Amino acid sequence: MPASFVAWSIAALAAGFGGLLIGSFLNVVVHRVPAGMSISTPPSACPSCHAPIKAYDNVPVLSWLALRGRCRSCRTAISARYPIVELATGLFFVVVAARIWPLGDVPTEAAPLVAALLELVAFLWLAGASVALAIIDVEHHRLPDAIVLPSYAVGLVLLGASSALSGDWDALLRGVIGMAALFVFYLALALVKPGAMGLGDVKLAGVLGLWLGWTGWGELVVGAFAAFLLGGLFSVVLLATRRAQRTGGIPFGPWMLAGAWVGVLVGGTVAASYLQLLTPA
């Protein structure tokens, strides 16, 4: 069995297991951050009877299944959202790991390997933040600074360190340009049409621009465009089914995040295919 396949499999399994654990933590984040609560204290407890949740009842997905979706103490039903978020985050992390480290493309030398690990951690951070921000924006129409602003520092530090080790400064330069470009673009939209874009969207745009630009120019363009395409299609569906008023507010953050991940995962392929169509044979 090739060493590269073994390394890739270990990375994918580690990402999936880590995603399950992070998903469990994100369930705490999406509940506490909008309420202004600490994410570390007090310990997790049943929202109904307030009994502390034991460590063996906090195993991602498995504990919910073992308890049949009920609190061990008061037997109150526990929302299925908890295991869904955990499982979805685990799968999301595997997909991200497979994108950042394609099979057969895992570095074996020390410096490139550490650079690739830093890049992977940066994208897994963005994946976890994306899950939390999407849920919070849907439920509260907010994109909390407590999640968005630290992402600038995390991205610049991790991706900058990756560039320093790999020598690929072009990727970091693209990232900084993408960060500035999307931030300015969304800020202009917010100023031209107040209310159409919130400041939370503007701040998130810079974060997404950093990661998209790092990935590539095609990914940046596709990711930026996909947000408006997906959000527009969703709005049309809601209006067509009369599930939303024409003046009703629809959170745009989830579509920014979804569009960005379309850009990261398939943006390069989409951009190349489009350019090929425009290029005469």
List the predicted regions and their residue ranges.
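Long, highly hydrophobic alpha-helical transmembrane signal-anchor segments
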Residues: 1-34
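Hydrophobic alpha-helical transmembrane segments
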Residues: 12-17, 83-88, 120-124, 149-150, ...
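C-terminal ends of transmembrane helices
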Residues: 24-32, 68-78, 130-142, 186-196, ...
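Alpha-helical membrane-inserting segments
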Residues: 26, 30, 92, 96-100, ...
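Membrane-proximal soluble regions of multi-pass membrane proteins
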Residues: 26-84, 252
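Transmembrane helix-loop junctions in multipass membrane proteins, especially transporters and channels
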Residues: 32-36, 40, 98-106, 138, ...
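Functional transmembrane core segments of multi-pass inner-membrane proteins
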Residues: 107-110, 114-115, 125-232, 272-281
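Interfacial loop-to-transmembrane junctions
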Residues: 236-263, 274
